[in-house]
C-alpha cells in the first residue's frame, strides 16, 4: 500500500498517535477482492497479514486514533473518539484515497476502560454488511478483510478477538464538529480548520469561505437524506444512529446491531439496548434530521443560524424525492417529469398502502418485492394476490396500482427491470449467525459462500436458493446486542 498522510500532518490536534497491539496467531477469515483493488492490493500475503494484525509495521503508515464526541441515544457524551479503531492513513488507489483502519487493533487513549478489541462475530458482521450494502447500491464504508486470532476476550462470555480492516472515504463524523464546539469551547478556529480540511479533501469545488461552508452543509443535508432514503427503501435498520456514527459524506458507517427486515415491521427494533425504539426502523428518517440539527448546532460559530436552518429545511424534500425515486423503481412506476406535490403525495400513499398491507399480512419485505419480477402487470389477476389474507384490501390497492402504472408494452423487459432493483439476496441476521457459528467451528466455507452471494444480490444464483428463503422461526426478527 502507498499512503498519504493528510489528516495526520494537517490536523495534529484532532488525534492521538497510538500503535496497534498485535493479536496472537493471526489468520485470514475473510477477504474482499473488490475492496483490495481500491487500494491496489493483489492478494492476501503473509506479510500483509502480519501488518494488518498489528504484529508488524506497515510501511508508510502513521497509526492514530481520532478524537470526537457525540449524542448517544439523545444525550451528549463530551469525549468519545476511536476506542478500538486505529487508522493507518489514506491509502492511494486508482479511484482516489481511502482511509485504512484496523477495527479491534487494541486500546487507545479513547478506549474509556475498554480493551480496544473487537470480537469475531462483530468483525464478521461488519465485513458482510459493508459489502452487502455496497452491492445493493447503498453508500457505505467498505471492508477489506477480517483477521481472526486465538486471543480470548471477555464480553457476556469469553469470545475470540478479531480485526476488521475497514476502508472509508473519510472517518470524519458529525461528532468531530461537536467536539470542537461543545467539549472544547472557544475553539472556533479548530472548527474552521476542520471545515477547510474537509472541503479541500472531499469538496474541492467549494471555496473555503462562508459561501463554501453554506454549500457544503446543504450537501451534507442532502447526502444524509439520500442515505436514509436508501435504508428505508431496501429495508435496513442501522440500530445505533448516534451522531458519532454519522459520516460527514453520507456513507453507512460504524455497524453494530444492524438488521435487514425479514417480515415488514415499521416499528422494528434491531438493537437489544434500545427498548424504547429510538432507532427503530421507522424512526430513522426523523433521527437523521435530529442528528443534522445537532451538527448544525455545532457549526453555529462559523455559519449563521439562518443559513443552517434554510439548509435543514431542505432535508424532508430531499428524503422524499430520493425515496420516491427508489420506490417507484421497485414498483415499476414511471418517473413523472416535473411531478407536482399532489402527484408525489399520491405515489407516497400508494407505496404506504402497500407496506401497510405487507405488515398486516406479515409478509417478507425483500421476497415480496422480488415477486414483482414475476408479475404480469397487464393481468387483472395479480400473482401476488395469494400472499394476502385480506383480498378485498389487496384488490383495491392493486386496482389503484394498475391505474398509476398504465400500459406496459414489453412485459419481459419490465420484469427484468424489477429484478434489477429488488434484490433476491440480503444479509439476513440468521444467515450471518449461521456463518459465525461455522467460523467458530473452524469452517470458513459458509462465510465465503454468503460473501460471494451477497456480491450479486440481484442475480438469480439458483444454486444458492436456500439463502433467499424466509428465516426459520428461530431466525425471524433477531435482535442483536451492542456488545462487540
From Swiss-Prot:
Active site positions, chain numbering: 244
GO molecular function, one term: AMPylase activity
Reaction(s) catalysed by this chain's protein: L-seryl-[protein] + ATP = 3-O-(5'-adenylyl)-L-seryl-[protein] + diphosphate; L-threonyl-[protein] + ATP = 3-O-(5'-adenylyl)-L-threonyl-[protein] + diphosphate; L-tyrosyl-[protein] + ATP = O-(5'-adenylyl)-L-tyrosyl-[protein] + diphosphate; L-histidyl-[protein] + UTP = N(tele)-(5'-uridylyl)-L-histidyl-[protein] + diphosphate
UniProt-annotated binding residues for ATP: 81, 83-84, 103, 115-116, 166, 173, 254
Cofactor dependence: Mg(2+); Mn(2+)
EC numbers, comma separated: 2.7.7.-, 2.7.7.108
Pfam families cross-referenced by the UniProt entry: SelO
Keyword NADP: no
Keyword terms, alphabetized: ATP-binding, Magnesium, Manganese, Metal-binding, Nucleotide-binding, Nucleotidyltransferase, Transferase
Domain of life according to the entry: Bacteria
Residues annotated as binding Mg(2+): 245, 254
Class of enzymatic activity (EC top level): transferase
Stored NCBIfam families: PRK00029.1 (NF000658)
Family according to the record: Belongs to the SELO family.
Its biological purpose: Nucleotidyltransferase involved in the post-translational modification of proteins. It can catalyze the addition of adenosine monophosphate (AMP) or uridine monophosphate (UMP) to a protein, resulting in modifications known as AMPylation and UMPylation.
Protein name: Protein nucleotidyltransferase YdiU
Gene it is expressed from: ydiU
